[in-house]
Amino acid sequence: MLTSEAVVAASARLGPTSGPKQEEVCQPSGAVHESIIRAPLDYLLMLPGKNVRGKMITAFNEWLQLPAEKLEVIKRIVELLHTASLLLDDIQDSSKLRRGLPVAHSIFGISQTINSANYAYFLAQQELPKLGDRRAFEIFTEELLNLHRGQGMDLYWRDSLICPTEEEYLAMVSNKTGGLFRLAIKLMQMASETDKDYVPLVNLLGNIFQVRDDYLNLQSDAYSKNKGFGEDLTEGKFSFPIIHSIRANPANIQLSSILKQRTDDNDVKEFAIRYIESTGSFEYCRQRLAELAAEARELAKDMEGTATHAQGIERILGMLGIME
């Protein structure tokens, strides 16, 4: 349900309602050019999100101790890349809502939104020299390649109606979701004096984030309000609980057939969710989340073994919604 306050806030960020004069529309100044190009990007940036990546960067900085100016550069890079990926995801997934408001391409159009997302990638790249280390370009390129590899496989499985194995899915998640997490931590490690490697821990956290997100997509009322009810079913996505449910009884083609329909029918989606529940797939998600969180705690303990770092990993897991 869209509140009037949210709509007003969105409109205010994008400019006055009275609009420019006709000649200004035809011949915009440089500043207006920029606002036009950035409009889909700025629209999504102003919508309040969970800011998980920004909070995680802050949490890891308790260990890595970066100078404040470099920390802010890395946060800007990650925010731009994440927002760009959401703009494109919403187009590729035919999404209707993002953070409880209409998706950017439903307002600005698909072409302008794609251009704005691509523009954001280069705005992020433009920040790299501020870190003062040429390795930043290698890290940036490597993890953006990984992100697109992961997204490519996710789309391929969906569009070809091919159900991956759990192992294949988590490998894809490591590229797609883990890519931005790793990019942030690798840039932080590059700019830090520590010799600790936090990448294995971040890989685990990326898996935890995605498995929980897949679970909430089909189980959370708050998620439904922000993204739509059972959105992964409408998208036709092979998410973690859906993969488990299909593979629990391969002879039953009901769930895969529902995915093929890309249905908007809530009754059909409720039927699918009951079926997923009947195969123990939501319980399996909760079990795997507990196992992954235990692995993360153990890894953090092996790396540091101090009370401060134990508290740090608990704060990070808490941000991901995983409590001990």
Swiss-Prot record:
Q: Where does the chain bind Mg(2+) 3? A: 213
Q: Which cofactor does it need?
A: Mg(2+)
Transferase as a keyword?
yes
Task: Establish whether keyword Disulfide bond is in the entry.
Answer: no
Instruction: Note how many cofactor molecules are bound and how.
Output: Binds 3 Mg(2+) ions per subunit.
Q: Which GO terms describe its biological process?
A: alcohol biosynthetic process; mycotoxin biosynthetic process; terpenoid biosynthetic process
CDD domains annotated for this entry? Answer: Trans_IPPS_HT
Q: Which SUPFAM superfamilies match?
A: Terpenoid synthases
Q: What is its EC number?
A: 2.5.1.-, 2.5.1.1, 2.5.1.29, 2.5.1.10
Q: Which terms are listed as keywords in the entry?
A: Magnesium, Metal-binding, Transferase
The catalytic activity, as recorded, is: isopentenyl diphosphate + dimethylallyl diphosphate = (2E)-geranyl diphosphate + diphosphate; isopentenyl diphosphate + (2E)-geranyl diphosphate = (2E,6E)-farnesyl diphosphate + diphosphate; isopentenyl diphosphate + (2E,6E)-farnesyl diphosphate = (2E,6E,10E)-geranylgeranyl diphosphate + diphosphate
Residues recorded as binding dimethylallyl diphosphate, renumbered to this chain, are 98, 176-177, 210, 217, 227, 237
- Coiled coil regions, renumbered to chain: none
Q: Which GO terms describe its molecular function?
A: (2E,6E)-farnesyl diphosphate synthase activity; dimethylallyltranstransferase activity; geranylgeranyl diphosphate synthase activity; metal ion binding
Q: How is it used?
A: Diterpenoid pyrones display various biological activities and FDDP C shows anti-cancer and anti-HIV activities. FDDP C also shows inhibitory activity of 42-mer-amyloid beta aggregation that is involved in the pathogenesis of Alzheimer's disease.
Entry's InterPro entries?
Isoprenoid_synthase_dom_sf (IPR008949), Polyprenyl_synt (IPR000092), Polyprenyl_synt_CS (IPR033749)
Q: List the disulfide bonds.
A: none
Q: Record-annotated residues binding Mg(2+) 2?
A: 89, 93
Binding of isopentenyl diphosphate occurs at 50, 53, 82, 99
* Pathway(s) per entry: Secondary metabolite biosynthesis; terpenoid biosynthesis
Spell out the family assignment given in the record's similarity comment.
Belongs to the FPP/GGPP synthase family.
Q: What does this protein do?
A: Geranylgeranyl pyrophosphate synthase; part of the gene cluster that mediates the biosynthesis of diterpenoid pyrones. The first step of the pathway is the synthesis of the alpha-pyrone moiety by the polyketide synthase dpmpA via condensation of one acetyl-CoA starter unit with 3 malonyl-CoA units and 2 methylations. The alpha-pyrone is then combined with geranylgeranyl pyrophosphate (GGPP) formed by the GGPP synthase dpmpD through the action of the prenyltransferase dpmpC to yield a linear alpha-pyrone diterpenoid.
Q: What protein is this chain from?
A: Geranylgeranyl pyrophosphate synthase dpmpD
Q: Source species, please?
A: Macrophomina phaseolina (strain MS6) (Charcoal rot fungus)
